[in-house]
Amino acid sequence: MQTKPNILLIYTGGTIGMIKDFETGVLKAFNFKKLLQKIPELKHLDCNIETISFKKPIDSSNINPEKWVEIAEIIEKSYADFDGFVVLHGSDTMSYSASALSFMLENLNKPVVFTGSQLPIGDLRTDAKENLITAIQIASLQQKGKSVIHEVCLYFEYKLYRGNRTTKINAEHFNAFASPNYPQLAESGVHLNVNSNLILPKQSTKKLVVHKNLDGNVMIVKMFPGINELVLSAIISIPNLKGIILETYGSGNATTDDWFVNILRKAIKSGLHIINVTQCSGGSVNMGQYETSSQLKKIGVISGKDITTEAAITKLMYLLGQNVAPAVFKTIFETSLRGEMA
């Protein structure tokens, strides 16, 4: 007789964990140990559920690499005892966290599903129940006793995405996330339809490796008409700065002004890693397609291809934390490690 999957619910904070005090109207933190009382539907799921919470749940605006390590360590310590993990997280930075965890959890052979909500769990119109119930169902999916999904995902409003391909696109709608450059992994309707051919392949029998060193000496710089030499020079000169995500126009284009190219050339020669990521919501960087990007290619700017900004900055933190040799850094960044780029 096949045993039920064991699922660990990890509550970090966020709107999903709030409940409205109907007397005062104030949102207050919800005790997740009493989860079954508030969502009795969970009793009908074909899995065993346990919960764990941050000692001090946080608003996702306060998430940082130290908190990512905390999530990773919870998964690491519980990995042998559970078949899947659901991380409850505020939606504002969920794509950053899902991207970071995808790089930190090497050889992952179990599902880690991030989810949250736009309305609190106690609100009459909440999207929290559907997101939570379906995320748990997805984490429980098995074939012949093995997990169907073995990567870090994000589930929101009927759709499951690869975590490091997502970005938040709306502050108010329930359909708050998108995966512009990679199809959805699954969709929930009358049936739960999984696109198995799109899921990352199982990592054979390799042991889970949890990478906990992330280097935060990085920055995101967005190109805009009027960016000036004084400001960019000041940014490049920040002490201990090791990498920049440069959000460029279109397919990787930027101003061809001599001062701009010279600043970047000097920075790259000094060891600074500069990654070219499009500021468009979809599409890919293709340096050399236009004159306005050919100079960037010549001076050694790294192509982010079709990576999201969220995945780019967390991948940069991860690779810097691994002390990747400068000679191979560009090659490794331009290589897909966890399905984050084409």
Where in this protein do the model-derived segments appear?
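Buried hydrophobic positions in well-ordered alpha/beta secondary-structure cores of metabolic enzymes
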Residues: G13-G14, V86, A135, Y158, ...
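Accessory alpha-helical/coil subdomains and C-terminal extensions
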Residues: K4, I10-G14, F32-K43, R162-S251, ...
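Short, ordered loop/turn segments at secondary-structure junctions
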Residues: T12-G14, G90-S91, S117-P120, Y249-G250, ...
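Short glycine/serine/threonine-rich phosphate/pyrophosphate-binding segments
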Residues: M18-I19, T93-A98, N131-L132, N253-T255
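ATP/NTP phosphate-donor binding region
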Residues: M1-K77
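Internal gly/pro-rich beta-alpha loop/helix module
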Residues: F114-G189
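Short Gly/Thr/Asp-enriched flexible loops that form oxyanion-binding sites at enzyme active sites
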Residues: L88-K110, T256-I263, T292
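C-terminal non-catalytic interaction/assembly regions of soluble proteins
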Residues: S251-A342
